[in-house]
Amino acid sequence: MRRITRIFVHCTASWQETTTMESLRREFMDKGWKAPGYHYVVFPDGKVFKMLEEGLVANGVKDYNSNSIHVAWVGGIKYDVKRRLIPVDNRTDEQKVALFDLLTKLKIRYRGAMILGHRDISPDLNHNGVIDPWERIKQCPCFDAYEEYADINKIG
């Protein structure tokens, strides 16, 4: 039995209209990974799909996977005015509700775990105790998961 200490929130950095479970599985297989990057995926309609059993290790955050559960929402990208891909919090209302419900259930199951965004493990380069935007290795999940789920993190 794995000891879960972190629940990471991700975005898939993919298009909400065209992403499927099969396209996500194919993406991870094409990377040569033995396991997908997420345990759960939340689609724009709020439906939650299990991609990997919780007892198995996903490839969500390098060096943090053995003791983590990974949850992703589909989306997180758009084009800017110059047609460059940029990160965006484009979660639907249904995704927000489904994420909150799923994360609450996971936090109750793994009471000692902390809910974080993928970006929250970036190094604090200026040692001010905060991961500033310029320090982030990734923008994922495109919003402040630690702040948004602070009340859930109090469970435990």
Language model features: what each stretch is:
Residues 1-56:
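Short, conserved "active-site rim" segments that organize catalytic pockets and cofactor/ligand binding
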Residues 48-62, 124-137:
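Charged, often glycine-rich, active-site loop that binds/positions anionic groups
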